[in-house]
Amino acid sequence: MKRKIGLITAMVLGTIFLQAQQNTTHTGSTGFGLRAGVNFQNINGKDENGNKLENDMLTGFNIGINVEIPVAPDFYFQPGLLYTMKGAKSTDVILGQTFNSTIKISYVELPLNLLYKPLLGKGHLLLGFGPYVAMGVSGNVTITGSNTSQSRDIKFQNTVKITDPNNVVYMKPMDAGANMIAGYEFRNKVSFQLNTQLGMLNINPEYASMPNDKTSAKNTGFGFSLGYRF
């Protein structure tokens, strides 16, 4: 899995670099950027009985690179590559005891945005939207109570067989959805950005032992980030 992710990452970076080099030759306006920020993520959906999930937001982070490729006046294609943390928190009362759960899932994410970047004052307005795809790389679930505390790693697979180990938490490896961005880039190339994200894939796997499982889990959230463009 890690070798496959590394190969995909290398191919994406190579494609972005070659495309950027071609556009730099012709227009001189393609730019690379670095970006890092904070996420406020949640997992929405339904439990195995079809009841709405009641989760709380988890604070995470994201860091990565992107490139702006001009496609028309004030419009850019902006692919990126991010390492980002998603997940959620929840509190449950079972037999009179309170348990706090935290799910943390790390992804390598590829956003593909169309960016509108007109002049505004001494800088540029940033408005964009587009799809994203992401691959899970690691994660864990921690559960704490008054007399107990345990942590389990997340294993990524689409289907869970009856014979699979039960000492891990299973999640589907792929996530995908839509995102929107709004922000401002100052004259010194520093930018501030707000982003929102809506996951469209169910990241809960299928369990062979639970044919009537109604669980649906989708990533959603928003965040703030700072960037610098070269």
State the predicted function of each range:
Residues 21-64, 122, 145-147, 161, ...:
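Short glycine/proline- and aromatic-enriched beta-strand/turn motifs that initiate or cap beta-hairpins
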Residues 27, 72, 119-122, 187-189:
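Outer-membrane beta-barrel channels and translocator barrels
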Residues 28-30, 57-61, 104-110, 174-178, ...:
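Residues that define the transmembrane beta-barrel architecture of outer-membrane proteins
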Residues 38-42, 83-87, 109, 118, ...:
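Transmembrane beta-strands of outer-membrane beta-barrel pores
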Residues 43-55, 85-105, 137-171, 203-217:
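Flexible, solvent-exposed loop segments that connect beta-strands
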Residues 52-98, 189:
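Glycine- and aromatic-enriched membrane insertion/assembly motifs of diderm outer-membrane
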Residues 75-77, 123-125, 188-194:
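Repeated loop/turn-to-beta-strand initiation elements of outer-membrane beta-barrel proteins
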Residues 166-169, 175-180, 185-230:
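Predominantly the C-terminal beta-signal and adjacent terminal strand-loop region
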